[in-house]
Regions:
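Surface-exposed extracellular loop regions of Gram-negative outer-membrane beta-barrel proteins
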Residues: 132, 136-141, 184-196, 207, ...
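Signature of Gram-negative outer-membrane beta-barrel scaffolds
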Residues: 61, 65, 87-224, 351, ...
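Repeated loop/turn-to-beta-strand initiation elements of outer-membrane beta-barrel proteins
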Residues: 85-88, 171-174, 226-229, 277-280, ...
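Gram-negative outer-membrane beta-barrel transporters
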Residues: 168-171, 285-288, 309-414
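Outer-membrane beta-barrel domain signature, strongest for Gram-negative TonB-dependent receptors
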Residues: 1-99, 103, 279-283
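Conserved small/polar residues in nucleotide/adenosyl-binding loops
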Residues: 419-421
Length: 422
């Protein structure tokens, strides 16, 4: 705050942001000339700015965003062979995950301290007098190695019980499995944020409860030694990630409204052919998800305020085909080929509620984000792979690989697809 952005690609430093033609041309020339004072991080300037700070505290600093995760799991399993062909497996499990998140000062860049406040609120006409990140330690002096900004725990408790039944004959294999469980998630804040004083930020939040499950069935048949066909279907639900369950995990105990499990339904058909020097496998698949949840933080230009957006009812449809082949070219030479083609798209229009980040005021409730039929981003929908391996004597080898991806789309924005209702 109260200093130029350290990011060279900050949008205000880009030529396209400049409205004055002369300034725009100057910025274009700077970037074309690759002037490192503008195109790279200027560390010397950060130290100079810190030396000239009015109150002696750091203006620029380096921080670590620390995540400390501890997992504990207990598992008990049993197996009963009812007959030569029929096997029953069963078990129970319990798990607990404790995750601690906080910011830690790494480097004050020439200064000796930093005051722990929310500096982005200083010029706010409404909340400019609520700057404390921790009311229990107001205006805390932060030195290198100290925690500041936010500090909270996220705990997930899970328990489940399940079983499976497997039947094997000469050519036929059938398998069915089921698991049901219960899960709870809660946040525990170690700082009392002035914006959300009391138990709105400090201490334990309300626990959120879920009932995840998994049902899976498969059947496979070997027509001969070389030909095998297998079909699998499944249905499951999972507990959402903690980031998608609270409006702002860093300093707010408030959960989203009506949290629910994400549902997933799918089917696969696999064919395998095994020859003397070739092994080939082809797969057809379809996966449908529903009731997904996401929380995003952004500056809403429509409402001119920093906002927390909670989206519910996110659903996707993915289907396609995959094929792999392992070819033995010679005694020491192997060739691996793989390809996939699919269509991955959003199938539902999520329902979105927008909150003001500073006070959780509802800015827009149950608006529709028209993402249905948009392509899922960040995942290639066409892929190809080839790998050549040579295995030499005495354990050494040489490997060469090539890969290609296509039809990769930018992830659609829940915000840009949003229709505001006023």
């Amino acid at each position: 705050y109260d200093a130029p952005s350290p990011m060279p690609d900050y949008y205000r430093w880009m030529p396209g942001y400049q409205t004055d033609p002369v300034t725009r041309l100057e910025m274009e020339n700077i970037w074309r000339a690759n002037d490192v004072r503008y195109t790279q991080i200027d560390w010397d300037e950060f130290y100079r700015q810190n030396r000239n700070s009015k109150d002696g505290s750091a203006t620029y600093l380096m921080e670590d965003r620390v995540e400390r995760i501890a997992n504990m799991q207990l598992l008990a399993e049993g197996i009963t062979r009812i007959s030569e062909r029929l096997t029953v497996r069963y078990g129970i499990r319990a798990a607990r995950t404790d995750s601690r998140f906080y910011k830690q000062m790494r480097d004050l860049m020439g200064r000796s301290y930093f005051v722990d406040r929310d500096y982005y609120l200083i010029d706010d006409g409404v909340y400019g007098n609520k700057l404390q990140n921790d009311l229990r330690h107001p205006d805390r002096i932060i030195r290198e190695g100290d925690r500041f900004g936010y500090d909270y725990d996220l705990r997930r408790n899970e328990i489940g019980a399940g079983g499976s039944l497997e039947y094997r004959a000469d050519r036929l294999r059938a398998f069915i499995a089921a698991e049901v469980g219960a899960a709870s998630v809660f946040r525990r804040g170690h700082y009392e944020k002035e914006l959300f004083a009391g138990n709105k930020s400090f201490g334990k939040s309300r626990a959120l409860h879920f009932a995840p499950y998994l049902f899976r069935a498969s059947a496979g048949y070997s027509f001969s030694v070389r030909h095998h066909l297998e079909m699998t279907v499944y249905a499951s639900s999972r507990t959402p990630d903690g980031d998608d369950l609270f409006l702002n995990l860093e300093y707010n105990n408030r959960p989203v409204e009506d949290p629910t499990e994400e549902k997933r339904y799918g089917a696969e058909l696999n064919y395998t052919w095994s020859g003397r020097n070739v092994r080939f496998r082809a797969t057809l698949f379809v996966v449908r998800t529903a009731d997904g949840m996401q929380v995003r933080h952004y500056y809403d230009d429509f409402y001119a305020t920093y906002s927390d957006m909670a989206a519910a009812g996110i659903g996707t449809l993915r289907y396609g085909a995959e094929a792999t082949a392992l070819i033995r070219l010679a005694y020491r030479w192997n060739l691996t080929l793989a390809a996939s083609a699919g269509r991955y798209r959003y199938a539902d229009n999520p329902v979105v509620t927008v909150y003001a980040d500073a006070n959780n005021e509802v800015l827009d409730r149950n608006a529709t984000s028209y993402m249905g039929d948009c392509s899922v981003g960040n995942t290639p929908q066409l892929t190809g792979f080839a790998g050549l391996n040579y295995y030499g004597p005495k354990g050494w080898g040489v490997q060469a690989e090539a890969a290609w991806t296509g039809n990769r789309f930018v992830e659609p924005s829940l915000v840009l697809s949003l229709i505001h209702i006023s």
